[in-house]
């Protein structure tokens, strides 16, 4: 086992604090609408330019092991805030640095670290409660656009596209961000339910120009197993032909004689039909077939449920206003399922998302939820160079998470002002001793840090801005760093999601509290490389 180096008390805290400062100072320059860029060297390819706090934090690794521990603890703040709220990583880092600095001073002056931490926790609890009470629900499309614009560092175009995407697919819909081949931002919205399965034979195509199958007001037959023989299907096929409506068959597979018979009937013009494979695999396939059944008001033909193909009636079939099938995808628009059934299924999937511990399962469940509840929107981000595209994509990702957070828990005045306004919640908090009272005062001072940093990044004096904000008690009154004006931040469109502000403060205080209460640090001793031995002379004469 390698030898370890141990540092205690002030020596440990000083080394750790240096690491915290290096990390925070690199991240904090990106805060606010006039935040600066950070250039990150890559081992291959062009350097990456970003204004995303968590991206900067993830790149920092320090040579000194003890300093690095402090930096990595601060990186944890950014990562946790990013995971919970998707944005606010720089705010969380700035808050954590402020709490750690003030806490370290208090510990150095002889106060009990555990009581300080208890005081910090009491203060954060009170502030979070006050933030929740003051959050305003997001109702208008314009407010969503404002949240997205702020999070995208003032890019109104990104804000507009995200608001449009949210409006079209709803709060439960899936919005994905991809890199575009052009220099513009593009939005593509897929209506209805789409899954990655195309037609089983090109002979089913009805629109030769677009090379796809288009069925209007169609029936849908959902079968869990393979179809290789149509004998059992003849009664239901005859009923469909009499109705004069098209039919889409979704089964594990349609092969051999069954597929040939369907193609021949389609070509002869007797039957408007198409067949596709069921999406997914194993148990996920069963769940997705059930989703399609609920969306279209049909029933999955499954022997496990005691439903046989030969006993199928028209009531078993699903219905949809429009179905489009191309080589790789099938889209079902406007299914005939009842709103109550779809709502019940959505609630069931949401419960599964809450329970699952697997990121992969959660992602797949969210995809299913989107297909049932809203739709899928794809935002394609373009730019002149690869570096620009990546930087813009980072900002769109941040903005997307911020808008979701705003819809979830509401909005607050932006620019760090919300934290300043709820400081009154700390007045009169009951504490067990003076050290806990100092912990509360640490948080009172620390929550000014985001406003000060935003002001400094915009070229203003932080203490002057904080002083002017304190002169007025109006909750929404603040400073717009983009324009340099004071006024109602809600009206100016400078707003932050309540979830982002809350998560930033909670995560910052959590990690900062641990750093303040650290009394010893252990790291591996760096290995000293000795001088290599001189090679033997090999019989040379001197």
UniProtKB/Swiss-Prot annotation:
UniProt-listed Gene3D superfamilies: GroEL, GroEL-like equatorial domain, TCP-1-like chaperonin intermediate domain
Keyword Iron-sulfur: no
Binding sites annotated in the UniProt record for ATP: 30-33, 51, 87-91, 415, 496
Main location: cytoplasm
Classification via InterPro entries: Chaperonin_Cpn60_CS, Cpn60/GroEL, Cpn60/GroEL/TCP-1, GroEL-like_apical_dom_sf, GROEL-like_equatorial_sf, TCP-1-like_intermed_sf
Enzyme Commission no: 5.6.1.7
Reaction(s) this enzyme catalyzes, per UniProt: ATP + H2O + a folded polypeptide = ADP + phosphate + an unfolded polypeptide
Subcellular location: Cytoplasm
Keywords from the UniProt entry: ATP-binding, Chaperone, Cytoplasm, Isomerase, Nucleotide-binding, Stress response
One Pfam family matching this protein: Cpn60_TCP1
Cellular component, GO, one term: cytoplasm
EC class (word): isomerase
Record flagged with keyword Zinc-finger: no
GO biological process: protein refolding
Oligomer status and interactors: Forms a cylinder of 14 subunits composed of two heptameric rings stacked back-to-back. Interacts with the co-chaperonin GroES.
Role of this protein: Together with its co-chaperonin GroES, plays an essential role in assisting protein folding. The GroEL-GroES system forms a nano-cage that allows encapsulation of the non-native substrate proteins and provides a physical environment optimized to promote and accelerate protein folding.
Family, per entry: Belongs to the chaperonin (HSP60) family.
Protein name: Chaperonin GroEL 2
Species, as recorded: Rhizobium meliloti (strain 1021) (Ensifer meliloti)
Gene: groEL2
């Amino acid at each position: 086992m390698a030898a370890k180096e141990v540092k205690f008390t002030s020596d440990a805290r000083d080394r750790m604090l240096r690491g915290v400062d290096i990390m925070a100072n690199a991240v904090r320059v990106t805060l606010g609408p006039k935040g600066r860029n950070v250039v990150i060297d890559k081992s291959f390819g062009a350097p990456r330019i970003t204004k995303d706090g968590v991206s900067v934090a993830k790149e920092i690794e320090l040579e000194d092991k003890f300093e690095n521990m402090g930096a990595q603890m601060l990186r944890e703040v950014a990562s946790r805030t990013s995971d919970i709220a998707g944005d606010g990583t720089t705010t969380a880092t700035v808050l954590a640095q402020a709490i750690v600095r003030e806490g370290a001073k208090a510990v150095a002056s002889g106060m009990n670290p555990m009581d300080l931490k208890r005081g910090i926790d009491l203060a954060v609890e009170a502030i979070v409660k006050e933030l929740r009470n003051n959050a305003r629900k997001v109702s208008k499309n314009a407010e969503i656009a404002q949240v997205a614009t702020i999070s995208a560092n003032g890019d109104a175009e990104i804000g507009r596209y995200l608001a449009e995407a949210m409006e079209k697919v709803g709060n439960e819909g899936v919005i994905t961000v991809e890199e575009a081949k052009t220099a513009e931002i593009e939005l593509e919205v897929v209506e209805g339910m789409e899954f990655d399965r195309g037609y089983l034979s090109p002979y089913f195509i009805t629109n030769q120009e677009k090379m796809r199958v288009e069925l209007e007001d169609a029936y849908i037959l959902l079968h869990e197993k393979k179809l290789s023989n149509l004998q059992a299907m003849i009664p239901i096929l005859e009923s469909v032909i009499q109705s004069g409506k098209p039919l889409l068959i979704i089964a594990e597979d349609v092969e051999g004689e069954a597929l040939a018979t369907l193609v021949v009937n389609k070509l002869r013009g007797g039957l408007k039909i198409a067949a596709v494979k069921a999406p997914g695999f194993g148990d996920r396939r069963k769940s997705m077939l059930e989703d399609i059944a609920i969306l279209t008001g049909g029933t999955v033909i499954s022997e496990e449920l005691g439903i046989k193909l030969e006993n199928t009636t028209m009531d078993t079939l699903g219905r949809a206003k429009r179905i489009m099938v191309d080589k790789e995808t099938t889209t079902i628009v406007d299914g005939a399922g009842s709103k109550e059934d779809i709502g019940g299924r959505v609630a069931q999937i949401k419960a599964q998302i809450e329970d699952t511990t697997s990121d992969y399962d959660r992602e797949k469940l969210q995809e299913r939820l989107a297909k049932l509840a809203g739709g899928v929107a794809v935002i394609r981000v373009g730019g002149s160079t690869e570096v620009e595209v990546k930087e813009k994509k980072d900002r769109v990702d941040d903005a997307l998470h911020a808008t979701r957070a705003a819809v979830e828990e509401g909005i607050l005045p932006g620019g760090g002002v919300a934290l300043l306004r709820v400081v009154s919640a700390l007045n009169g908090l009951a504490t067990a001793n003076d050290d806990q009272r100092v912990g509360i005062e640490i948080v009172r001072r620390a929550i000014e840090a985001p406003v000060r940093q935003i002001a400094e990044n915009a070229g203003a004096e932080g203490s002057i801005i904080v002083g002017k904000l304190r002169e007025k008690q109006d909750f929404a009154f603040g400073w717009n760093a983009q324009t340099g004006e004071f006024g109602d931040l809600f009206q100016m469109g400078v707003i932050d999601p309540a979830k982002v502000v809350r998560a930033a403060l909670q995560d910052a205080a959590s990690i900062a509290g641990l750093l303040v209460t650290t009394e010893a640090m252990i790291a591996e001793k760096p290995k000293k490389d000795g001088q290599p031995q001189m090679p033997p002379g090999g019989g040379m004469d001197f």
